[in-house]
């Protein structure tokens, strides 16, 4: 019971670190939640503050995911890895420090996959890059990657706990993109380089 609690709380607190919010405050003197899409993730930071801050957010958010995997590994089981990882994903998008708001958990999920099964991470990232090259729409690319991750986990015969994480995490990330999906269907989702014209 104590081990499960450590995995849940540790994973959640790692994921909840509000990287995008802090970078917005320190780098640009802004509240990123009131800019662009209102997300604290790297894509909204890119649109609002530029490449340098966005790269910093991307790297730190991915590191949060990798740290959650390390925590679960230290607890001694692949199931604890999955539990800590899932709660890191939740923590990123529902940060207790930001009124349970946050990002879409894409970078955090990438960090988790890199630490969990790097061939899966690289293949999934390749799918993301392909989607971006074809459409220049980050959200569409992220949705493709969320679908691809469990398929690649299965195709590469990864352990069952990791496959279940990819399934659950993929569904969660897709759910976090529901407003993006609405805009994609309406043809109003911005592409890379386009300014955000809607309210957060």
From Swiss-Prot:
Subcellular location(s) of the protein: Cell inner membrane
Keyword Cell inner membrane belongs to the record: yes
Topology in membrane: Multi-pass membrane protein
SMART domains: G3P_acyltransf
GO MF term set: acyl-phosphate glycerol-3-phosphate acyltransferase activity
Enzyme class: transferase
GO biological process terms held by the UniProt record: phospholipid biosynthetic process
Keyword tags: Cell inner membrane, Cell membrane, Lipid biosynthesis, Lipid metabolism, Membrane, Phospholipid biosynthesis, Phospholipid metabolism, Transferase, Transmembrane, Transmembrane helix
EC number: 2.3.1.275
GO CC terms in record: plasma membrane
Pfam families noted in UniProt: G3P_acyltransf
InterPro entries assigned to the protein according to its UniProt record, in alphabetical order: G3P_acylTferase_PlsY (IPR003811)
Principal location: membrane
Reactions mediated catalytically: an acyl phosphate + sn-glycerol 3-phosphate = a 1-acyl-sn-glycero-3-phosphate + phosphate
Pathway this chain belongs to: Lipid metabolism; phospholipid metabolism
Function per UniProt: Catalyzes the transfer of an acyl group from acyl-phosphate (acyl-PO(4)) to glycerol-3-phosphate (G3P) to form lysophosphatidic acid (LPA). This enzyme utilizes acyl-phosphate as fatty acyl donor, but not acyl-CoA or acyl-ACP.
UniProt cross-references to NCBIfam families, sorted A to Z: glycerol-3-phosphate 1-O-acyltransferase PlsY
UniProt-listed HAMAP family: PlsY
Subunit structure: Probably interacts with PlsX.
UniProt-recorded name of the protein: Glycerol-3-phosphate acyltransferase
